[in-house]
Structure formats: C-alpha cells, structure tokens
Amino acid sequence: MISTNSVEFFTSIFIVCSAVIIIVLEQIFPYNKGQKIFRRGFFNDFVLYTLLQSYIAGICIFYSIRWLQAIGLQSDVHISSYLSPWQQLIVFIVVHDFYIYWFHRLQHKSRFLWRIHEVHHSSFEVDWLSGSRSHLFEILINQTVEFAPLFLLGASPEVAVYKGMTDAVWGMYIHSNINVKSGFLQYFINGPEMHRWHHANQKKALDKNFSTKLAMWDWLFGTAYFPKNEKAGSYGLTKVYPLSFIQQFFYVFRSRS
C-alpha cells in the first residue's frame, strides 16, 4: 500500500476521479434516459456525502489510531502482525459486508429501524449520489460497527482510510444510473442491475436485494430479485418525504399516523 503520509491524498484523488468517471458513464450509457445530474435534493445529498459518509469517518479513525498508538494505548490484538494491509482490508470488507446484509434486512423489518432507514429510500432518482442520503443515526450505527473492529483488532491505521474509500466508490457505483451488464459476476459482486431494484417501489421488488458489495448474500439467503427482461420503472417512497437534512433528521420523531 501507499505510505501513510500520502494515503489521504491518494484516496481523495481516487474518489474524485471515480465520481467523475461514473457521472460521465451515466450520461453516455444511462439506464433511465433524461435523468438530470442536478436533480431534486442534489446539493443536500452532496453535503451529506462529503461530510458524513464512510470516507471522512475513515480519515478520522486513521488519525485516532495513530494517536492512540503514539500515546501507548493499543489493542492487545494485533492483526497487523499477521496480515498485510491489503489482507486486512479484504477481511474487514467481507465481514462488514456480511453484517450489513443482515442489518439491512432488519432495517426493513423493524418499524423503528425503518423510520431511520426510509430516508435512504426517499429519492425519486437513483444515481451516483443518492446512496449518500442516510439519516444521521444510521450513519453513526453503521460506521461505529464498521470501524470499531479496526481499532479493537489492532489494524494498520491506513486500512480505515482504504475501507472508507472502498465504501464511497462502491456506493456510488451500485446506485449509479449506468446501464451496465455484469453477466455472471452479478451472482457474486453487487452492481447497479440488482441494487436499483432494491430502490424500486414496485411491490414485487420490495424487501429484496439487501447486499452492498457482495451479491452472493442475496443469492445464498433467498432475497435476490433480478428480472432480466423487466425494467425498474419508478423509485422512492410512495409518500412525500422532506428534502433538507434538518427536516429528515426530525421526521424520524413524527407521531404515528
């Protein structure tokens, strides 16, 4: 891996370049033609994405681990002594993805957790940025579970940043409006073909395709929905949902109707 002194610069450049490439591909090979780049809620989602998502959390934890190591507070377990940074990254990605699959399923079953999660499904357009729309509580829960093991297991500090970079780029990809065909890879690796159905509001697609990075969880546990000759027609909730971050935050606490 790249030295820890330049890891933030490299990952920042990689995310920006990935975003530009995905946006260009959305315009050249759109799944839903005519979908605008600056659609409803774009700037709000961009702020959420920039300030609150996994990459920024990864940088914070990167420096936290380095600081804790500098003052002598280290985990008794040192996974970095047994695995290279790349091996650590793969282990954490697979284990965290397995957790996310089951937690995601629970979010769709639990009335309380759905209130927190429904903001993620509120966008009527699914594109490279819509995946960033998440309630603050969901972000805190997921990123605590995501990054705490890195410190508890004594991971290399840069692994947190690379993990955040992977999450950011993959999140942009699976939500992108690109008419991509992954072929047999879609049975193992998640892509836009399956994940856009997760955001579709057609009844037959509800509570399907919970995987984030590894589509194999859906195929293994019977939640895969992948109609090859159908097109996802519309997305979002069937009710009006607020667009601003503040309104979305407090909407969770509304009285039950």
Role assignments for model-derived ranges:
Residues 1-8:
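Short, strongly hydrophobic alpha-helical membrane anchors
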Residues 2, 67-80:
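Membrane-interface helix termini and inter-helical loops of multi-pass transporters
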Residues 10-23:
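Structural signature of hydrophobic alpha-helical transmembrane segments
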Residues 24-42:
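Membrane-interface helix-loop junction between the first two transmembrane segments
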Residues 27, 46, 212-220, 248-256:
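A transmembrane-helix-recognition feature enriched in membrane-embedded lipid enzymes
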Residues 48-59, 65, 82-237:
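Membrane-embedded catalytic scaffold of the fatty acid hydroxylase/desaturase
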Residues 233-257:
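A membrane-cytosol interface segment of integral membrane proteins
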